C-alpha cells in the first residue's frame, strides 16, 4: 500500500501547483521512463540524442564509453607527426606557415646530406647546361642520315621475313645490298669456266683480267641504286579508241531531213508495209 500513499501525496501536491509546473513534472517523468528503457538491455527503435531514427544496441564499446562519461574520437583527428606540426603552429598566423609540400627544396637537400655525408653540397647539383652538353656528347644523340638509316631498317626487316619464310620451305627472292655482295667471297669470285645449258654445245670461258680495277667495299655503297618507283615516269601509252555500239544509220542524214514532218514520215512507212504485205500474199489485212 506504500505506492498508493505516494501516488495520493503526489496528486495532492499537483493540485496545489500551477499548470506550468504540472507540465514540467510530467515531462520529467517521461524522460525518466525513456532512460530506464534505454538501459534495460532491450533492442528498441527510437529517436536518439543526435536526432536520427535507427536501431540502437545498448551493449557495445561505444555505449560503455558513454556510460562512463567518455566520448568517441571523431574521424579526421590529427595524430602523430601532423599533430606535432599543428602544435608548433600555435600562435603563428596561417599566412606565415611553412609550405606543406613534401618535395620542397629544403627537404631534398637534407635528404641528400643524409645519403652522402662526405660529398660536397655543390657536387650533387648539376645545371641544365651541363646536362645538355653531356647529352650532345653521347653517341646516341649524334646526327645521322635519317634517310639511309630508315632504308637499312627496311632491308633488315625484309631479310628477317625472308629467313622466316625460307625455314618453312617457301621460295623467297630478296635484294641484297652491294656491301653484302662484295663482302661475301662466294659471290665476288667468278668461276673459271661455265658450261652452257643450251643444246648448241658451245663452251664459254671467263678469264680473270688483272688490269681491271675492283671497287672497295666502302665505294660499293656509293654505287647508283635503282630509282624509286614513285620517281620514275611511266612511258605514255597510245590513246585507245573507245569501243562502243556501231550506229546503223547516219545521224547526219536524219538531221538533214528537215523538210518532212513526222506525220508524213509515218505515212510513208505505213504505205511501205502495206505494199510488202500485198506482194507476199499474206492473210492479214491492215486497216488504215
UniProtKB/Swiss-Prot annotation:
GO molecular function: mRNA binding
Keywords: mRNA transport, Nucleus, RNA-binding, Transport
InterPro entries: FYTTD1
One Pfam entry name: FYTT
Listed GO biological process terms: mRNA export from nucleus
Places the protein is found: Nucleus, Nucleoplasm; Nucleus speckle
Region feature Disordered, mapped onto this chain: 183-202
Principal subcellular localisation of the protein: nucleus
Motif UAP56-binding motif: chain residues: 11-29
Gene Ontology CC: nuclear speck; nucleoplasm
PANTHER family linked: 40-2-3 PROTEIN-RELATED, UAP56-INTERACTING FACTOR
Annotated function: Required for mRNA export from the nucleus to the cytoplasm. Acts as an adapter that uses the ddx39b/uap56-nfx1 pathway to ensure efficient mRNA export and delivering to the nuclear pore.
Similarity-based family: Belongs to the UIF family.
Name the record gives this protein: UAP56-interacting factor
Species this protein is from: Xenopus laevis (African clawed frog)
Gene that encodes the chain: fyttd1
Amino acid at each position: 500500500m506504500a505506492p498508493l500513499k505516494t501516488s495520493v501525496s503526489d496528486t495532492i501536491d499537483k493540485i496545489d501547483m500551477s499548470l506550468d509546473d504540472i507540465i514540467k513534472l510530467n515531462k520529467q517523468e517521461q524522460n525518466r521512463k525513456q532512460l530506464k528503457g534505454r538501459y534495460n538491455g532491450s533492442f528498441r527503435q527510437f529517436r536518439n540524442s543526435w536526432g536520427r531514427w535507427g536501431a540502437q544496441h545498448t551493449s557495445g564499446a561505444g555505449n560503455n564509453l558513454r556510460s562512463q562519461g567518455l566520448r568517441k574520437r571523431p574521424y579526421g583527428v590529427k595524430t602523430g607527426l601532423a599533430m606535432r606540426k599543428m602544435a608548433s603552429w600555435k600562435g603563428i598566423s596561417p599566412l606565415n606557415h611553412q609550405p606543406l609540400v613534401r618535395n620542397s627544396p629544403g627537404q631534398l637537400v637534407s635528404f641528400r646530406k643524409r645519403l652522402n655525408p662526405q660529398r660536397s653540397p655543390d657536387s650533387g647539383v648539376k645545371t641544365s647546361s651541363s646536362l645538355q652538353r653531356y647529352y650532345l656528347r653521347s653517341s646516341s644523340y649524334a646526327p645521322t642520315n635519317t634517310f639511309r638509316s630508315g632504308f637499312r631498317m627496311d632491308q633488315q626487316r625484309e631479310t628477317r621475313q625472308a629467313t622466316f619464310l625460307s625455314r618453312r620451305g617457301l621460295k623467297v627472292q630478296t635484294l641484297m645490298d652491294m656491301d653484302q655482295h662484295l663482302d661475301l667471297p662466294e659471290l665476288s669470285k667468278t668461276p673459271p669456266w661455265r658450261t652452257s645449258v643450251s643444246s648448241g654445245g658451245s663452251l664459254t670461258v671467263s678469264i680473270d683480267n688483272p688490269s681491271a680495277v675492283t671497287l672497295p667495299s666502302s665505294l660499293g655503297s656509293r654505287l647508283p641504286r635503282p630509282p624509286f618507283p614513285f620517281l620514275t615516269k611511266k612511258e605514255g601509252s597510245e590513246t585507245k579508241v573507245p569501243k562502243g555500239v556501231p550506229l546503223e544509220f547516219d545521224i547526219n542524214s536524219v538531221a538533214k531531213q528537215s523538210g518532212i514532218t513526222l506525220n508524213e514520215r509515218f505515212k510513208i512507212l505505213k504505205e511501205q508495209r502495206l505494199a510488202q504485205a500485198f506482194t507476199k500474199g499474206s492473210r492479214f489485212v491492215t486497216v488504215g
